[in-house]
């Protein structure tokens, strides 16, 4: 049987790669570059449209634990990320183009995967096995088809991305290199005095934004709040939030600045840097004006402006079973952010999980839940089985895991034990039920 995968984002790429490398025939549909979305820039698979950071690799961080589990199951996302890595302190950050190119080439090299560069606006639900992994920027044509198939069980939220500037346009006379608490020198830090901070805050509060249809502040995703919305919540909100100076010492003064705008490398050559936590929906001319309030960015060349977009996802607890299959048509799977998981790694992990169970089904075996002691198992169980009311997008966090049998007072020690238990549970599971 051929597995039809719609969408070559992180989740769809994991499905296609993990099945294709095991000899399963896959047809992977991707409409880009023939038809682009409002947030994508290339035709590569697994293009990262928000941040270039894949977050922590430390297992005492929920994102790090998730990666450790994904490595055990096998992940093209993490294989490509290693080849595209750029310096970013304790976080795993990548050169977007190298990363997406690595994923694309790995999938296109598989003989059992046929890549079809066409938009899918409909398909026969009765024919074959389908995996819908079109992400939050699902095209209007397919969205209409899915709405007819699923009913009105669609939800949405808004998120935004940050501007990117060229390194050569950053005035390093007004900036310094360093990570928090002296743990590296991978970030460019733009210190602000109290007067400069107030000027920036006022500019953000007063700036004009791009109006969006159906926009509702209650639907802003918490990890991608536009910086102007944070600014409007209070004068000090930014310097206790994305512009906090904690652990950053300006070598010119020997002190922590009043506030700091951090810049993170976007590419291996270090030509481009993004503003950390500076997601925005300001009009483009306003973004220019606001950035000029930051001393080291007074002459910055903006190569990508911040934008906001609406993300669509389905009401998974109502529509899907624990294996991410449609309850009423179990030959149709969903994977990625369209299911309500939030985050790059979470999306990729859901693709691995779907691929694992599709593989089992095609081999005549029953699909399996992952252990709830694992971050992957706990996240997917939450999305499908434990939500009360409408689903809100959920990302990996230690609060999803069942408690330890013995109490550990120290937060770090507790997370370490939870992580060790999760990794051991995943190892045992894969030993008993391998691909």
Swiss-Prot record:
InterPro entries reported in the protein's UniProt record: FAD/NAD-bd_sf, MnmG-rel, MnmG_N, TrmFO
Main location per the UniProt record: cytoplasm
Organism: Thermotoga petrophila (strain ATCC BAA-488 / DSM 13995 / JCM 10881 / RKU-1)
NCBIfam families listed in its UniProt record: gid_trmFO, PRK05335.1
Gene (UniProt): trmFO
MF-aspect GO terms: flavin adenine dinucleotide binding; tRNA (uracil(54)-C5)-methyltransferase activity, 5,10-methylenetetrahydrofolate-dependent
Known role: Catalyzes the folate-dependent formation of 5-methyl-uridine at position 54 (M-5-U54) in all tRNAs.
UniProt EC number: 2.1.1.74
Protein name per Swiss-Prot or TrEMBL: Methylenetetrahydrofolate--tRNA-(uracil-5-)-methyltransferase TrmFO
